[in-house]
Amino acid sequence: MSAINTLPPIKSIFNDFKEITKAGLAISVVFSSLAGYLLGIHEFNLETIYVLLMLAIGGYCMVGASNAYNQIIEKDLDTLMNRTKNRPIPSGRMSVNTAFTIATILTITGLTILYMINPKTAMFGAISIFLYTCVYTPLKTVTSLSVFVGAFPGAIPFMLGWVAATNDFGIEAGTLFLIQFFWQFPHFWAIGWFLFEDYKKGGFYMLPTGKRDKGTAMQIVLYTLWLTAASILPSFGYTGRLYLTPVSAIIVVLLGLWMLVYAIKLYKNKTDKSAKTLMLVSVAYISLIQVVYILDKFLR
């Protein structure tokens, strides 16, 4: 048999690359960065479109690298959980050395591209990788406070786009960071709820009380309220160039109430089904909020 015939098919390699970088998650994170960038630019021209493309590629590299490092660190724990045991490393389809090489190349490529945009963007990208890989990931098996720590790198992308557009970290970027920071809690606690048994096999502490109880559900409700409050801050005129018109502010409030309804349903029902529904609603919420912000800017 020839050496060529013993190589894995291209499609299989591509699928493993998508899985080691968590392509779906990476694309959603890149969308947040692009949304922040569109909010930060003054006008569309060839230069802004070029930077937009650089941000998309550099952002994917950074998120993909973080996810690859995460799977390297958790390779033994991933074999214990149903949802992760078929990932490239625990299944044996990819070696740790290959995964590390991919992660390293993505890190170098991503940081280089982001630095070409401006040094601040590269700095925040590097901070994100460090916090996610070296702090959040190890803490997941130690304390439920890992979600709090993970919320910091998780909140960077929306803000990163603004920094890429303006080369500045001010009240606007801080507001975008705050929105995505509060969003992390109901989103990841909902995931921690309906995947509780699987996480338990891996020894992960994801829920604030350690249980699927009213205490956890109440905190989800409270953070959903904080999220809604943070999301309408730009409507009060104290967030610099980041501003929401009254109509958009009403839409944002309605979206917040929509998510709050499902958070309250989880509090009342305390079921995995309610938690999974809330998780899906939270994903829709953050994307819709970003779309509303963008449309408000360009259509006002």
Curated annotation (Swiss-Prot):
Gene3D superfamilies: UbiA prenyltransferase. Keywords: Cell inner membrane, Cell membrane, Heme biosynthesis, Membrane, Transferase, Transmembrane, Transmembrane helix. It comes from the Bacteria. InterPro entries: Protohaem_IX_farnesylTrfase, UbiA_prenyltransferase, UbiA_prenylTrfase_CS, UbiA_sf. Pfam families: UbiA. The keyword Translocase does not apply. GO terms for cellular component: plasma membrane. It is found in: Cell inner membrane. It catalyses: heme b + (2E,6E)-farnesyl diphosphate + H2O = Fe(II)-heme o + diphosphate. It is a multi-pass membrane protein. Pathway: Porphyrin-containing compound metabolism; heme O biosynthesis; heme O from protoheme: step 1/1. Its EC number is 2.5.1.141. The keyword Endoplasmic reticulum does not apply. CDD domains: PT_UbiA_Cox10. The chain crosses the membrane at residues 24-44, 46-66, 99-119, 122-142, 145-165, 176-196, 220-240, 244-264, 275-295. One of its GO terms (molecular function) is protoheme IX farnesyltransferase activity. It is an enzyme of class 2 (transferase). Its main location: membrane. GO terms for biological process: heme A biosynthetic process; heme O biosynthetic process. Carbon 2 of the heme B porphyrin ring is defined according to the Fischer nomenclature. Belongs to the UbiA prenyltransferase family. Protoheme IX farnesyltransferase subfamily. Converts heme B (protoheme IX) to heme O by substitution of the vinyl group on carbon 2 of heme B porphyrin ring with a hydroxyethyl farnesyl side group. This is Protoheme IX farnesyltransferase. The lineage of its organism: Bacteria, Pseudomonadati, Bacteroidota, Flavobacteriia, Flavobacteriales.
